[in-house]
């Protein structure tokens, strides 16, 4: 038997509005509970997992409180807060998994979880011997790196050939989980002539510029942001591909830089996740006048190609074209620090992370 700590939804939030993180407030969005779990509770096909790492993703905002039922149904009071993670199998009544196996799963914000037979179908067994640390499967070999891969190879339809080399890229949210890998793919695979990397604050600007001499960082918090963005690009109508993770005024400023018939790839809109008014896009006329190609990205649309993509990402890591140390930030959520799990996730929206933000819940063996 194990005593699981679980963060559950306490109060149903208003879709699009900020969550309440004041844990002693009766109106708090979340509640930390404890629950006894044991192998005796397992039904046929089920697993008992110990969570090792949790992935922190902006999209969890909508997994918890849905604004669009086509994307996610949301969470009801008493249900565990959803999150992807890595866990160790403690007990199994499923022939495909044995105690001691590590798996990628939707664990939720919990130290231990029973995975139903229905959800076992989405599990992926992880080979610990192929990586230095298991958290690599959430960073350079995880969903955000897969997103970056598909942006280039599927949505932009780029190939490793001369005609696709030397392009100019604009990347917003460039210091984040998707952005850092996009910078490296642009530079190290597609030989970008320039990457304009938008990040928040001088430290983040210095971080994105550390990826290479062809990277020009621009601070979106700077009062002269729009002018400095134009200067970094060398003027308007200079960018071939704009990979946007932010939305709002950053998106509107970036569209000005795109060439005619350039491509805008919409990957996220983190600036609007706590303020729906920022979903408004005022640059629609430029889509028409510049004849832009606009594509929206959901990584799960490409699930059949995950094995191929992971092989490629693994090769890029092996050959030093993706830097492991610059691709993730780890936070400690072990023991009593598990109480900080919601606050660690909240840090995404104030930009505490460089690369993928991962919470450690239990030690690897």
Swiss-Prot record:
TM segment ranges: 134-154, 170-190
Q: Write out the entry's keywords from A to Z.
A: Membrane, NADP, Oxidoreductase, Transmembrane, Transmembrane helix
Q: Which InterPro entries match?
A: ADH-like_C (IPR013149), ADH_N_2 (IPR041694), GroES-like_sf (IPR011032), MDR_fam (IPR045010), NAD(P)-bd_dom_sf (IPR036291)
Q: Does the keyword Chloroplast apply?
A: no
Q: Which organism is it from?
A: Saccharomyces cerevisiae (strain ATCC 204508 / S288c)
Q: Which residues form the signal peptide?
A: none
Supply the name of the protein: Uncharacterized membrane protein YML131W
A Pfam family matched in the record: ADH_N_2
Q: Which GO terms describe its cellular component?
A: cytoplasm; cytosol; membrane
Tell me which domain of life the UniProt entry assigns to the organism this sequence originates from. Answer: Eukaryota
Q: Where in the cell is it found?
A: Membrane
Extracellular topological domain: 155-169
Q: How does it sit in the membrane?
A: Multi-pass membrane protein
For this chain, one GO molecular function annotation is: oxidoreductase activity, acting on the CH-CH group of donors, NAD or NADP as acceptor
């Amino acid at each position: 038997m194990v005593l699981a700590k679980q963060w559950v939804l306490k109060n149903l939030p208003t879709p699009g509005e900020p969550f309440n993180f004041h844990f002693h407030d009766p109106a708090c969005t979340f509640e930390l509970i404890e629950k006894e779990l044991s192998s005796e509770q397992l039904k046929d096909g089920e697993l008992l997992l110990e969570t090792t790492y949790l992935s922190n993703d902006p999209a969890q905002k909508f997994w918890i409180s849905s604004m669009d039922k086509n994307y996610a149904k949301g969470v009801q009071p008493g249900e565990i807060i959803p999150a992807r993670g890595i866990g160790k199998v403690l007990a199994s009544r499923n022939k495909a998994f044995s105690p001691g196996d590590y798996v990628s799963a939707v664990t939720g914000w919990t130290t231990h979880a029973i995975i139903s037979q229905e959800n076992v179908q989405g599990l992926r067994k992880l080979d610990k011997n192929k990586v230095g640390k298991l958290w690599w499967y959430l960073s350079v070999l995880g969903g955000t790196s897969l997103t970056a891969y598909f942006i280039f190879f599927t949505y932009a339809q780029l190939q490793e050939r001369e005609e696709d080399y030397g392009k100019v890229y604009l990347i917003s949210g460039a210091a984040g989980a998707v952005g850092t890998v996009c910078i490296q793919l642009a530079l190290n695979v597609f030989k970008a002539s320039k990457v304009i990397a938008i990040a928040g604050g001088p430290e983040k600007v210095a971080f994105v510029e550390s990826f290479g001499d062809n990277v020009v960082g621009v601070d979106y918090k700077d009062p002269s942001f729009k002018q400095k963005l134009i200067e970094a690009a060398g003027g308007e109508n200079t960018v071939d591909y704009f990979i946007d993770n932010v939305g709002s005024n950053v998106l509107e400023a970036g569209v000005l830089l795109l060439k005619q018939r350039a491509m805008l790839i919409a990957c996220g809109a983190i600036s609007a996740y706590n303020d729906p008014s920022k979903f408004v896009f005022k640059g629609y006329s430029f889509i028409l006048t510049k004849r832009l190609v606009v594509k929206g990205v959901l990584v799960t649309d490409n699930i059949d190609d995950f094995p191929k993509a992971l092989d490629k990402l693994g090769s890029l890591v092996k050959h030093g074209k993706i830097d492991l140390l610059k691709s993730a930030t780890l936070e400690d959520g072990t023991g009593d620090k598990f109480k900080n799990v919601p606050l660690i996730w909240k840090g995404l929206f104030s930009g505490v992370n460089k690369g993928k933000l991962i919470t450690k819940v239990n030690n690897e063996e």
